[in-house]
Structures are given as structure tokens and as C-alpha cells.
Amino acid sequence: MNTAKRYRLSVVMIVKNEADNLKVSLPAIADWVDEIIILDSGSTDDGQKIAQSHGAKWHVNTDWQGFGRQRQLAQAYATGDWILALDADEVVTPQLKNSILKVIKNPPTDTVYGIKRLDFVFGHQIDNALWGVKAHWRLYPKKFQYDNNLVHESVILNDATTKKLSGFLHHHTAPTPLFWLNKRLDYAKAWADDRHAQGKKGKFYKVVVNPLWAFIKQYLLDGRFLQGRYGLIYSLFFTQYTFNKYACLYDLTHNQAEHAFLHSVAMAQNLKPINVSQKKSTLSLVMICKNESKHLKACLETVHDIVDEIIVLDSGSTDNTRQIAESYGAKWHVNTDWQGFGKQRQLAQAYATGDYVLLLDADERLDQPLRQAITDVLKNPVQTDKVFSVARVNTFCGIEVQPRWWYADKLSRLYARQHFQYSDLKVHESLNQYGKPSMVLDGYLKHLTNDNLHHFLLKNIRYSDDWAKDKFTHNKNTSLIAGFFRAVFSFIREYVIRGDLLGGAYGYILAMASMGYTLDKYIMLWWLNNKDKP
């Protein structure tokens, strides 16, 4: 810490699980600032040990009320005349250090200083230092402070004089695509929740227009086209982040998932009994689940009376999923060594004893015609020359965006147990049919895809990561241009070919989310193959 006589400078940070970043950022400031104040919000890594090894004062507040209030609380611990607000992933360069030291020789009055920040993503610089880099108000007299915003917080300037410092902060935004996407989705949700709490209603035109403007601004106006492939990746990711913000806000106002759920419960309660006395084949219902207490009962209500056994393989539920399953006579098994959806379905099937397997997820429900069609199959001896598919109708945020008369997924879900099983794929697993044809059954399988848009987007990120790692393990590669065109095609397929355009605003949101998912997984795969290259 600095001991020279001058006005005191306090560095103020808020952190959570930032140990890796603190190892880089603290050495750049520890020997010349007067104090380092760090306010933690619940870290489980060794960040405190690292911080204290550099003389930082560590405080904790887990009552999170947003970034703005957390910065206010952190600043309250500071004793300096000047405040330098930093994030753990920001590194002060030597030129910036010298600029700061010159400023704090002067008494703190009414001047707030902006600091230009160069962003890095996955270790690559994505801002061009010669292209009008934006300054952030980070060095200021202690009498100033941050606003109350949950996200996108900033210093309240009032009538302050503003100046910009020479030198740069190096901002290491994310070490991996997965980290960036998860972090920005958290920001998008917090932003949407904050606006919704203020009475703001999401407008659909902003879901369409604002992401387009975000790309133009990030890639062209901010000069990231000068930074090659990583400048493009960042601009595409930021466009997706902007879409997520406005789409999540729209969903908070217009979501119909709870209505669709209650309708599915009522449907399950009003199904007619099925005569199963003429069955010649037995049927095992096979399910994999985790924390499905909300959906499982309604699912089992539509199927329990036509099957001979119910097999449930759980992967670590902490709710009352087991009690619900066992109330329907289910045989409960557990495997928490998760190896992907395909392997988990194989393990679940291994517990079954019926002639046929019917595979369902907890958020799916059989309608009356499909119940009857399955029972009709069981009236014959087990058939091994074909598998049976069901037409699945998806409700997205409670809306059936793809009209069933236009498009429905055809999924092989009913098959001879000893002759077929699911593939090993971690995500997007499917039945190995070994060249045997499928016969589509009458009726529909209703699928309650998600409770809200954020839940859907979060799953998409996880599935993208699983898909990319699986392909990388099998020595698959791709190019960025191929990933871009695949993403565009996925939008066309969803919006036009599958009829999302008939689903109104949510049809567009689903098509855009699908495009984002495709883009993410190919960028992740490309990055895995190129991360060690300059």
C-alpha cells in the first residue's frame, strides 16, 4: 500500500467467486493505492485469501439488492478522499496508473473522471484503442456515489465536471463462451425484473428492433469489425444479450405458462377410462427426472392406468418428486452420475421389464386419442419390425406457437424393450431404430416446454455447451461462417417451415431463441478447437 503524503485513494470492488480475476487485477494496484475495499456477496472460492494477501479489507453482504446498492454499501467502508471503482476482472495499465496518481495530488472537489476501457473476450482484445473507446466514470471524490440500479448502474453525476484520463483499463469480460453467456443472461433477467417492477411493459417492436441496432452499434459504430473474428463473436453475443433483455421483459407481461399448466391439469382430470382387458403385451413407462414435483402428477394422471409398471430414474431431486411418483406405484431409482440424457435414458430402460417401453418426460401429457392408440398397440403381440411415434405439440411460454395442423414433432417413444434403446448423445438424444420404420400414432402428446423464457434460454445455454463438448470429444470442428449460416437456417426453419410466424410475438421469440441456440453451440465448438491459437 502507498504511504506517501497526498490525498487518500480507496479502491472499491464488489465480487463473488472472482478468485482467478483477483490474482491478476490486485497486483496491478496493491503497491500504490491507500486501501482496497472488497464487498463479497457469497463467494465459495479462495478469493478472500487472495485479497487479504494483497492487503485488501474483506467485507460480506449476501442480502443482494442489485449492483447499484451493493456498490453503495462497499463504498461506505472506504476511508479515502478519492474513490476508484473497479471490478475484479479489470486491470489498471501503467499509463492509467500514472494518470490517476496525478489527479489525486489535487483535493477532491466536483470533478468526476472517466476511464477508457478496452474489452477482452476469451483472452482476445475486441476494442480498438484508436476507435473512440467509451469512458466509464470510475474515479471520483467520495461525496459522489452510484445509483440504485439493479444492473447497468452508474455514478450519479449531478452537476459534476467530467474529464477523461489517459490510459486504459483492460477488461477481461469472460474466459469462456459459457461464462459470458450465463453471466449476460443473469444480467438480462435482472434488467427485465427491474424494469417490470417499475411498471414497464415489454413492447414487441423492441424485441425486434433493439437487437438489430445493438449489432450495428457494437460491430460497426464501436469499431469491432477491426478486431477480426473475436470482434464479430462479441458483437453477435451482445446482440443476443440485447434480445434476451427485451424478450424477457416482454415475457414477464405476456407469459401464459401457468394458464397452460392449469389447463393441462384439468385435461388430465377429465380423461375417460381406457379398457385394457384385451392387452396381449405389457408396457413399462420409463421416465428420467429431477425436481419435477410441479409437473409429474399431471403427467402420470394421463398414463398410469394404461401401463403395467412405472420406472423413474432420478438424478438428484430435492423436492417431493419421489413421493408423487411412489403414490402412483412407481419404482424409484437414482443415478446422480450424470453422463447426459442418452446414457440416463439407457440406464432407466435397464430397470424396465415390460414388452414395450413408453418414454415420457414429466412435462408431457397424453391426450385421449393417444391413450387409446397406445392401448390398441398393446392388443397385439409385441411388434419388433417397427417403432411407434407420437405427434408432440409444444407450448412455448404457454403458447402453442406451431399450430398442430401445420407442424408437430414426430418422436419415436413406444418400442419393443429388448430390441431398441436410446443413443448415447448428451443432448438431442434419439432412439436407435436400426433401420426399422416408424408408425405415427393417432392423438397428440402435449409438451409444456418451459415455465418462462429465462428458464428456456438457460437450458439452451447448457445444451449448447453439452453439444459442443460432445462434438469436440469426437474430433468435430466447424468454421464461424458455417455456424452463422446454420443459425440463419435454424431461424428460417422455425419461423417459416415449422410455422412459428403463425404464433405471433412468441413465434418470433421462439425462432430467435432457436437461432441463438444454434449460433452458441457452433461458436462454442469453434472456440474449443481454436482457443489455444493466437
Label the model's feature ranges.
Residues 1-28, 253-302, 534:
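N-proximal low-complexity "stem/linker" segments adjacent to membrane-targeting elements
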Residues 20-23, 45-54, 95, 294-297, ...:
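Acidic helix N-cap motif at the loop->helix transition within catalytic regions
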Residues 25-36, 301-310:
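Short, acidic, metal-binding catalytic loop of nucleotide-sugar glycosyltransferases
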Residues 28, 40-49, 87, 302, ...:
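A conserved acidic beta->alpha catalytic loop
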Residues 32, 54-55, 158, 306, ...:
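Short, structured coil segments at secondary-structure junctions
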Residues 48-77, 308, 322-351:
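Conserved donor nucleotide-binding strand/loop of the catalytic core
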Residues 68-75, 82, 93-258, 263-276, ...:
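Catalytic-site signature of metal-activated, phosphate-bearing donor transferases
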